[in-house]
Regions:
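Glycine-rich phosphate/diphosphate-binding loop of Rossmann-like nucleotide-binding domains
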Residues: 1-93
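Adenosine-phosphate binding glycine-rich loop
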Residues: 4, 13, 134, 140-222
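Short, solvent-exposed amphipathic alpha-helical segments in soluble enzyme
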Residues: 33-35, 55-57, 116-122, 144-148, ...
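Charged, alpha-helix-enriched surfaces in structured cytosolic catalytic cores
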Residues: 47, 85, 92, 124, ...
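Short acidic/glycine-rich loop or secondary-structure boundary segments that cap or lie
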Residues: 49-50, 69-70, 109-111, 137-141, ...
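ADP-ribose/adenylate-binding Rossmann-like module
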Residues: 99-158
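Cytosolic-side membrane-insertion boundary helix
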Residues: 228-248
Length: 248
């Protein structure tokens, strides 16, 4: 990932593009940045720009304005014009980067196809695409679930769907931590009795039935959105000073 300068010459750092800045995308950004790569990332939600930049990556933006957030932290299906603009961006980036990590998912729908065969064919030999959306069909047209595909021009497309199982120790630790935290929220008295307090969003989103009443699905979670640009105050225009009187 990192570049090197040796007596034999200079090797530039790897260029990485991450599509989708959710939990998985931000983790990929952080990992690539810590290894010394030049990282750039894209997400349809403008409110994640600061998160991407805080992880050390460049946030790729489109010269196109459209509301992309669904109000619950997930992306929504975009218009054809927006998709056309982002596909043009991905096509340009594919020619430059060495690694592409895709994490784009839309709840309840197949993964959107964001990396076309033409984009992959334009990449340099030895480039790698890691499709973390392979289980839902994949973001890349070359992706085959549970397989590593090597294209004719030497690009590897990784479509594993069992990545947590490939890291069993770390996955078990993280899963166990989540369970402990969830049970702590629901047993605040530490007496073993579950209490569903709907004022806690973590408890509310996990509860499906309470007191015999179906409470699922929960209301959408409001997430922080990109702040609207503040209206600039227009200074009052002062009249020009009167002309000076001349002695002639």
């Amino acid at each position: 990932f990192t570049g090197q300068i040796t007596a034999a010459g200079k090797v530039p750092p790897a260029k990485v593009m991450v599509i989708g800045a959710g939990v998985a995308g931000l983790a990929a950004i952080g990992a690539a940045n810590s290894l010394g790569a030049i990282v750039r990332a894209f997400d349809t939600r403008p409110e994640v720009k600061e998160q991407v930049q805080s992880m050390g990556a460049e946030f790729l933006e489109l010269d196109f304005k459209e509301e992309a957030g669904s109000g619950d932290g997930y992306a929504k299906v975009m218009s054809e014009a927006f998709i056309k603009a982002e596909m043009a961006l991905f096509a340009a980036q594919a020619k430059e980067v060495d690694i592409i990590v895709t994490t784009a998912l839309i709840p309840g729908k197949p993964a959107p196809k964001l990396i076309t065969r033409e984009m992959v064919d334009s990449m340099q030999p030895g480039s790698v695409i890691v499709d973390l959306a392979a289980q839902n069909g994949g973001n890349c047209e070359y992706t085959v679930p549970n397989q590593v595909t090597t294209t004719a021009n030497g690009v590897k497309v990784i479509g594993y769907t069992d990545l947590p199982g490939r890291l069993p120790t770390q996955s078990s630790q993280l899963y166990g931590t989540n369970l402990v935290n969830a049970l702590t929220l629901m047993t605040r008295a530490r007496d073993g009795h579950l209490v569903s307090e709907f004022d806690d969003e973590g408890v509310r989103t996990r509860t499906t039935v309470r007191d015999g009443e179906i409470t699922f699905p929960p209301p959408p979670s409001e997430v922080s959105a990109a702040p609207a640009p503040a209206a600039k105050e227009v200074a009052p225009v002062e009249p020009p000073p009167p002309p000076k009187e001349r002695p002639w």
